[in-house]
Amino acid sequence: MKSIYRSLGKIHVCYSAPLHTSVEDHWVSATFASPTNKPITERQPTMIDREIELQTKDGAMNTFVTHPEEEGPHPVILLLMDAPGKREELHDMARRLGTAGYYVMLPNLYYRRVREFKIQESSREVMHEHMASLSNAMICEDIQSLIDFADEESAARDGKMGCVGYCMSGPFAFAAAAKFSDRIAASASFHGVYLYSDKEDSPHLDAEMITGEMYFGCAETDEYAPKKMVDGLENYLRGTNLNSRIEWYPDTEHGFVFPKRGDKYHKKSAERHWERLFAMYRRCL
């Protein structure tokens, strides 16, 4: 396993206990497990799920929101969808973050073109058209709308927030960390594409603006995020003061974190991805 650290100070990596969740309608009960795998029954948070219509200058952005019912306000985390779109699989991932004590927002980034996108019912060409319609600047405008909404929510805590992107949204999470450096204190990209490129808006160009922590989780075999791209990013970041980490996940392919990705799913690595996220958010938020 190859792990590369770039930090202004020492990073202490901690491991989160697994969460076991059961979902029924819009209410979630969670039982936490201790490092010894003995249930901790003292705290079983009730989760609130809802869909909101968040108004932006380009229209209504349907967004899934989940957070614990009590003990708020909670730090905000923005979970940015991958190319197949906002779906129940991602809702469950948002819930897993939320049960740890976060206010999680999952927006439909394709809202300018379609309210719901289901890859099973559409061709990959349509998906690629949706992807090509987006830009880092557009997504940052959407994130500003998400921040504005969260700032008015009593269950959402003001101040430092987190972000995570997958696949196509990896560069969005990278760009957002720079654009909103006063708010985003911890951001992560998993099997992110175009993190380092010759595009005019390549997110690596603004890396020096990031004041928070940045994590990049990379699949060992990834035709969409090849080693050459990641190596270029690594070399570039060596010349910056960005508090960052690039970590390779052995024996994995693009999409390894998603349980419904068939044989691409790699459970051990997917759990490590959760450990890295929870540890970073605990450190920074």
Segments (PLM) and residue ranges:
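N-terminal cap/leader regions of alpha/beta-hydrolase-fold enzymes
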Residues: 5, 9-12, 21-26, 32, ...
